[in-house]
């Protein structure tokens, strides 16, 4: 993963979005 993708996933998790 790129740094941007990793940070985006972290933000989604913080927002309460489940990531498969």
From Swiss-Prot:
Span of domain ATP-grasp: 8-20
Enzyme class: ligase
Pathways involved: Carbohydrate metabolism; tricarboxylic acid cycle; succinate from succinyl-CoA (ligase route): step 1/1
Reactions catalysed: succinate + ATP + CoA = succinyl-CoA + ADP + phosphate
One Gene Ontology cellular component annotation held by this UniProt entry: mitochondrion
Keyword field: ATP-binding, Ligase, Mitochondrion, Nucleotide-binding, Tricarboxylic acid cycle
One annotated GO molecular function: succinate-CoA ligase (ADP-forming) activity
EC number from the UniProt entry: 6.2.1.5
The keyword tRNA-binding belongs to this UniProt entry's keyword annotation: no
UniProt GO BP: tricarboxylic acid cycle
Subcellular localization: Mitochondrion
Membership in a protein family: Belongs to the succinate/malate CoA ligase beta subunit family. ATP-specific subunit beta subfamily.
Function noted in UniProt: ATP-specific succinyl-CoA synthetase functions in the citric acid cycle (TCA), coupling the hydrolysis of succinyl-CoA to the synthesis of ATP and thus represents the only step of substrate-level phosphorylation in the TCA. The beta subunit provides nucleotide specificity of the enzyme and binds the substrate succinate, while the binding sites for coenzyme A and phosphate are found in the alpha subunit.
Subunit text: Heterodimer of an alpha and a beta subunit. The beta subunit determines specificity for ATP. Interacts with ALAS2.
Name recorded for this polypeptide: Succinate--CoA ligase [ADP-forming] subunit beta, mitochondrial
Gene: SUCLA2
């Amino acid at each position: 993963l790129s740094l941007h993708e990793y940070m985006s996933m972290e933000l989604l998790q913080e927002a309460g979005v489940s990531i498969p």
